[in-house]
Amino acid sequence: KLIALAGIAMSLSHATAPLSGYEHDISHVLDLIAERTPRPLAQHGTQVALSTLLTTNAYQIFFDEFEPAEINLENCYPTEAQMRARVEAAFRPMDPEGQVAAECWADYKIKLESWHAHRADFEEALQDWSAIRTQLRSLVKPPDVTMQILKAISSPVRFAELVPAPTEDEIRFAFRNAPLIRHRFTLGDLLVFLQWDQETLWKQVNKNH
């Protein structure tokens, strides 16, 4: 049933986004780093599973700490110039010619425009955040559930077990910059727009992982 529903969701959206979120974006950035190193790619599915440990931790922190009354709504809507500069600053070091940054920006620009266009929806969600948080908590499994599944199938449970293994700096970079590479909207994007302290969040999820 779940597989069928997933297929329907992808068909209706004309995209894989319903089954491909923040964790997939992290894996894609790790692949991008590997390609530019260059070195062989680690197994994508295993990278996604390990990234899920990070993102489910991030979800739990978000559920626990986010309070709409504490945000400045105007600051949640950066300009195109601001975000283009951020994308270019993130990816230009790995590709001085700018091709990677240009490709990332082409996708990201679509997402940024959509975020601005749906501001009223976000404001409505903020008003109903208590109910939304309760619903989302029931849908997002905690990281220890993912860990139990990985152990049950004898899968790697740490990035250091991947072959080849990314460095901690590369994982940190991927976690922080994954929202900048695709037009799908994930928790990572919301955290960027909320101006969440990414370094603090990284230390929290990395410590928990």
What are these regions (language model features)?
Residues 1-63:
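Core active-site phosphate/anionic-ligand binding loop and the adjoining beta-turn-alpha structural block
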Residues 66-209:
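C-terminal charged capping/lid subdomain of soluble metabolic enzymes
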